[in-house]
């Protein structure tokens, strides 16, 4: 790269010289003579200087003279390159003390030897005076260059040199930046790799900072934990820095499995790494320091948490040596701080170490079964196993932990596929594990649904009811509670044997159905023998409606029934071939028409209750129709609404009405008076309570004034009558109680239930007909026939009763509306809603009357004083106020 600027400098200088020369003769073209042609004779011959080159040959000289006479070229025109085939003659030199060509003297010409043969035509030739061509010398008569041309030449040369220098500096700067970036890109990876390698090794064989290595081609120890870096310190350990002068030691060891190895302790490479090989000892105060690698159990299966994973190898490449550093680390947690759970496991496992403390062994995943294996042999993950035990205790004199390393480890095996968790368990319990066996059993129990409650802390200062509970007073049925309240886990399989992975029950019944049947059998607490005996005798009272309904849900399909019937009797006792649900169903299928019997018995059990419900419903409907027709207060209310509505609709098409549908009763509260509070229903109720209060006779039990009736004022009499009339109107809801019940019924459901009862009798007859062909069914047929005689009679009575009630409902609908309704029970719903509104209005009117009594009653009122009515009485020509307080018209109504 440094030669480029110099080449550029040389080319620039060359062109600068030629440029200066061209500027000096800038006014002459190439085809014009440099000096005007002189016709005078050439100057006299002067002998050439000894330093000049020899003169050309006579042939060249004569050719030159001929060319001068014919073409007369310019005297100073120079041709730098010429061809051998037709070489142009060299131009004559101007008057000069040392001319380039000598005069044409025959003697001098003859003295020179003949010229050499010309070169080939393809190669150019250079004239002998190339130096004079590059650097021409002017004669004395030529005009010297002026000062302006010299200044321009110097300026141009300096500019070119400066530009070349700047370009050179820029090129050097670019090269420097590229090298710096290349170093920065390569150095972080190397530093990170070496730093990680040093941090991951608990005992460093040599530092990675460029210091001299002990062995260039020896791999670092493999069997170290990837997380025993300086960042992870543990309680109760301290580094002993006095063990810096240790030398590398080797001691053979033997494992229980016949595996031999060498314990190698490399010396520390620097003072910074000497602490890694120091002894760990107890301190009085807790201080966090790194622990030695974990010792191995007497089992080939390592123990890990559910969140940890195995990473069998890890390779780091160190510079040009390509040295592989293998470490053991849980996958997914490299470079992270270990969880407290992992630290606790390390402490527990360290207590079981062979030497007590300070011992070390290889990682379970990277330990090779054969230490003498060839490097070319590839180990599979299956062949990787941890050491079982050590026959001899391994310890150093100064307590420094050692590492178990093979003489020449084989190449690392390929990593196994990543797994979510390692289902490994310990072969024996840890020392000092005082956990109860009950706690171990609880861990194997299935998870149940959670009961959310508030726990009460035990108190030693007071006596509580919980103190009287004994541990053995109540035993939980584990089998039942697990069956009923177990949390459904689709990934796990049940441990109670209800649904077995490989069993005969999956070949006969659907697994879900089989599971449900088993749950029902446990919940009902009934055996197959009891059910079969009740089915044979036809005793429906023994089983009950709930059990019969559950049995009916267990009915298998035709295909399942055929499979269960094909089972041999020898297979019944084999729990591996048939499950509890299949056993129960097979026992039922041994009875002829078992599920038809169950259906018939369920009908018999429900028959009495169904008949009673339907008869009661029909009685309610019948009573409701009678209440609507015969309740005087309801009819009086309809009369008041009709007359009030005709009065309001005078002059319209809705006036002079003779009847209205009961739906109008619900619209009375929508019409409000001028005050915005009193509605049309309030007005009707006020008028009715006046009329009804006047009709109620006074008795001593009804009035506290008794004998002093004549002395009471008219105001008090009017308020008392309103109070009595309000009680009569508000009692309308109690008089129409059956109407409210009938409003909750559905005519379609009553009709369908009646038809279903009638169809059930037909099913019982069908079962009796089919069982007459079987043997051993006498007791069942006897039970069915006794019910059939009574049931047919009750069904006939129920159907006739239902028909009569439906006719009455239709009649009452026509009685109020004049025609039949699509929904015959709708009239009861309308009346029920109106009664709810009427009760609310009566309460509001009662509160208004009480405020009127306490706000308007004088302390001493004269006997002849009359009270002002709450509502003004409007008397027109066609109406008058009767003495009884009712509004009488000319027609005599109300």
Swiss-Prot record:
<dbReference type="GO" id="GO:0045010">
    <property type="term" value="P:actin nucleation"/>
</dbReference>
<dbReference type="Pfam" id="PF02181">
    <property type="entry name" value="FH2"/>
</dbReference>
<feature type="compositionally biased region" description="Low complexity">
    <location>
        <begin position="101"/>
        <end position="111"/>
    </location>
</feature>
<feature type="compositionally biased region" description="Pro residues">
    <location>
        <begin position="407"/>
        <end position="418"/>
    </location>
</feature>
<keyword id="KW-1133">Transmembrane helix</keyword>
<feature type="compositionally biased region" description="Polar residues">
    <location>
        <begin position="331"/>
        <end position="342"/>
    </location>
</feature>
<feature type="compositionally biased region" description="Low complexity">
    <location>
        <begin position="270"/>
        <end position="288"/>
    </location>
</feature>
<dbReference type="InterPro" id="IPR015425">
    <property type="entry name" value="FH2_Formin"/>
</dbReference>
<keyword id="KW-0812">Transmembrane</keyword>
<feature type="domain" description="FH2">
    <location>
        <begin position="438"/>
        <end position="864"/>
    </location>
</feature>
<comment type="similarity">
    <text>Belongs to the formin-like family. Class-I subfamily.</text>
</comment>
<feature type="region of interest" description="Disordered">
    <location>
        <begin position="203"/>
        <end position="228"/>
    </location>
</feature>
<feature type="signal peptide">
    <location>
        <begin position="1"/>
        <end position="20"/>
    </location>
</feature>
<dbReference type="GO" id="GO:0010497">
    <property type="term" value="P:plasmodesmata-mediated intercellular transport"/>
</dbReference>
<feature type="compositionally biased region" description="Pro residues">
    <location>
        <begin position="41"/>
        <end position="57"/>
    </location>
</feature>
<dbReference type="InterPro" id="IPR027643">
    <property type="entry name" value="Formin-like_plant"/>
</dbReference>
<feature type="compositionally biased region" description="Polar residues">
    <location>
        <begin position="351"/>
        <end position="377"/>
    </location>
</feature>
<feature type="compositionally biased region" description="Pro residues">
    <location>
        <begin position="112"/>
        <end position="122"/>
    </location>
</feature>
<keyword id="KW-0732">Signal</keyword>
<feature type="compositionally biased region" description="Basic residues">
    <location>
        <begin position="59"/>
        <end position="68"/>
    </location>
</feature>
<dbReference type="GO" id="GO:0051015">
    <property type="term" value="F:actin filament binding"/>
</dbReference>
<comment type="function">
    <text>Might be involved in the organization and polarity of the actin cytoskeleton.</text>
</comment>
<dbReference type="GO" id="GO:0016020">
    <property type="term" value="C:membrane"/>
</dbReference>
<dbReference type="InterPro" id="IPR042201">
    <property type="entry name" value="FH2_Formin_sf"/>
</dbReference>
<feature type="compositionally biased region" description="Polar residues">
    <location>
        <begin position="390"/>
        <end position="399"/>
    </location>
</feature>
<dbReference type="GO" id="GO:0051016">
    <property type="term" value="P:barbed-end actin filament capping"/>
</dbReference>
<protein>
    <recommendedName>
        <fullName>Formin-like protein 2</fullName>
    </recommendedName>
</protein>
<keyword id="KW-0472">Membrane</keyword>
<dbReference type="GO" id="GO:0003779">
    <property type="term" value="F:actin binding"/>
</dbReference>
<feature type="region of interest" description="Disordered">
    <location>
        <begin position="41"/>
        <end position="129"/>
    </location>
</feature>
<feature type="compositionally biased region" description="Polar residues">
    <location>
        <begin position="298"/>
        <end position="310"/>
    </location>
</feature>
<feature type="compositionally biased region" description="Pro residues">
    <location>
        <begin position="86"/>
        <end position="100"/>
    </location>
</feature>
<feature type="transmembrane region" description="Helical">
    <location>
        <begin position="156"/>
        <end position="176"/>
    </location>
</feature>
<feature type="region of interest" description="Disordered">
    <location>
        <begin position="264"/>
        <end position="440"/>
    </location>
</feature>
């Amino acid at each position: 790269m440094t030669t480029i600027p110099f080449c550029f400098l040389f080319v620039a200088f060359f062109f600068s010289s030629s440029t200066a020369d061209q500027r000096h003769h800038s006014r002459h073209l190439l085809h014009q003579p440099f000096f005007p042609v002189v016709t005078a004779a050439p100057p006299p011959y002067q002998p050439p200087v000894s330093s000049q080159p020899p003169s050309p040959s006579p042939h060249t000289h004569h050719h030159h003279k001929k060319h001068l006479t014919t073409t007369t070229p310019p005297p100073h025109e120079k041709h730098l390159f010429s061809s051998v085939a037709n070489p142009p003659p060299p131009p004559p030199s101007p008057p000069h003390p040392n001319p380039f060509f000598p005069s044409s003297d025959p003697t001098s010409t003859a003295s020179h030897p003949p010229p050499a043969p010309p070169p080939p035509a393809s190669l150019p030739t250079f004239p002998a005076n190339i130096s004079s061509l590059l650097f021409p010398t002017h004669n004395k008569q030529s005009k010297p260059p002026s000062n302006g041309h010299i200044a321009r030449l110097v300026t141009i040369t300096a500019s070119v040199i400066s530009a070349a220098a700047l370009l050179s500096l820029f090129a050097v700067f670019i090269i420097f930046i590229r090298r710096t970036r290349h170093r920065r890109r390569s150095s972080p990876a190397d530093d990170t790799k070496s730093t990680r390698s040093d941090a991951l090794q608990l005992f460093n064989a040599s530092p990675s900072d460029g210091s001299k290595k002990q062995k260039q081609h020896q791999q670092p120890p493999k069997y170290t934990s990837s997380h025993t870096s300086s960042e992870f310190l543990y309680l109760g350990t301290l580094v002993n820095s006095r063990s810096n002068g240790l030398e590398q030691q080797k001691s053979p060891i033997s494992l229980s499995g016949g595996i031999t190895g060498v314990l190698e302790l490399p010396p520390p490479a620097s003072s910074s790494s000497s602490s890694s090989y120091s002894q760990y000892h107890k301190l009085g105060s807790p201080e966090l320091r790194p622990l030695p690698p974990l010792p191995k159990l007497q089992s080939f299966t390592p123990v890990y948490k559910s969140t940890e994973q195995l990473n069998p190898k890890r390779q780091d490449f160190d510079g040009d040596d390509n040295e592989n550093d293998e470490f053991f680390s849980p996958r997914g947690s490299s470079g992270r701080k270990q969880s407290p759970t992992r630290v606790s496991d390390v402490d527990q496992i360290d207590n079981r170490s062979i030497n007590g403390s300070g011992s070390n062994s290889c990682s379970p995943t990277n330990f090779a079964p054969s230490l003498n294996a060839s490097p070319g042999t590839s180990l599979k993950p299956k062949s990787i196993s941890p050491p079982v035990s050590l026959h001899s205790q391994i310890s150093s004199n100064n307590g420094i932990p050692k590492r178990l390393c093979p003489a020449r480890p084989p190449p690392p095996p390929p990593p196994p596929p990543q797994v979510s968790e390692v289902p490994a368990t310990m072969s024996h319990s840890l020392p000092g594990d005082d956990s109860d066996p009950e706690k171990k059993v609880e861990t194997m129990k299935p998870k149940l649904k959670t009961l959310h409650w508030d726990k009460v802390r035990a108190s030693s200062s007071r006596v509580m009811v919980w103190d009287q509970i004994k541990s053995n007073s109540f035993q939980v049925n584990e089998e039942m509670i697990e069956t009923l309240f177990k949390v459904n886990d689709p990934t796990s399989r049940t441990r109670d044997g209800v649904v077995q992975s490989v069993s005969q029950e999956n070949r006969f019944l659907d697994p879900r159905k089989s599971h449900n049947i088993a749950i029902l059998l446990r919940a009902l607490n009934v055996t197959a023998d009891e059910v079969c005996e009740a089915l044979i005798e036809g005793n429906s009272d023994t089983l009950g409606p709930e059990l019969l309904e559950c049995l009916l849900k267990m009915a298998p399909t035709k295909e399942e029934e055929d499979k269960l019937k094909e089972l041999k009797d020898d297979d019944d006792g084999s729990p591996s071939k048939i499950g509890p649900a299949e056993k129960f169903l097979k026992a039922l299928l041994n009875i002829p028409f078992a599920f038809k019997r169950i259906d018939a018995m369920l009908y018999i059990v429900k028959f009495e209750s169904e008949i009673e419900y339907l008869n009661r419903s029909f009685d309610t409907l019948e009573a409701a129709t009678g209440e609507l027709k015969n309740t005087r207060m309801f009819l009086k209310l309809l009369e008041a609404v009709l007359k009030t509505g005709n009065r309001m609709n005078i002059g319209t098409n809705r006036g002079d009405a003779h009847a209205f549908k009961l739906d109008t009763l619900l619209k009375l509260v929508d019409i409000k008076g001028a005050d915005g509070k009193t509605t049309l229903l309030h007005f009707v109720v006020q008028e009715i309570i006046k009329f009804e209060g006047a009709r109620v006779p006074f008795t001593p039990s009804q009035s506290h004034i008794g004998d002093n009736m004549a002395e009471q004022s008219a105001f008090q009499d009017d308020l008392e009558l309103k109070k009595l009339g309000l009680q009569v109107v508000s009692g309308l809801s109690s008089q129409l109680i059956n109407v409210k019940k009938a409003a909750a019924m559905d005519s379609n459901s009553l009709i369908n239930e009646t038809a279903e009862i009638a169809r059930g009798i037909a099913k019982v007859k069908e079962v009796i007909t089919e069982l007459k062909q079987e043997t051993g069914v006498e007791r069942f047929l006897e039970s069915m026939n006794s019910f059939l005689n009574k049931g047919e009679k009750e069904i006939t009575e129920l159907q006739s009763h239902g028909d009569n009630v439906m006719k009455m409902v239709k009649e009452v609908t026509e009685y109020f509306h004049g025609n039949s309704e699509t929904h015959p029970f709708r009239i009861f719903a309308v009346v029920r809603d109106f009664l709810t509104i009427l009760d609310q209005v009566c309460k509001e009117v009662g509160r208004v009357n009480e405020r009127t009594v306490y706000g308007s009653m004088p302390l001493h009122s004269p006997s002849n004083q009359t009270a002002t009515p709450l509502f003004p009485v409007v008397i027109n020509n066609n109406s008058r106020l009767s003495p009884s307080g009712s509004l009488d018209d000319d027609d005599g109504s109300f």
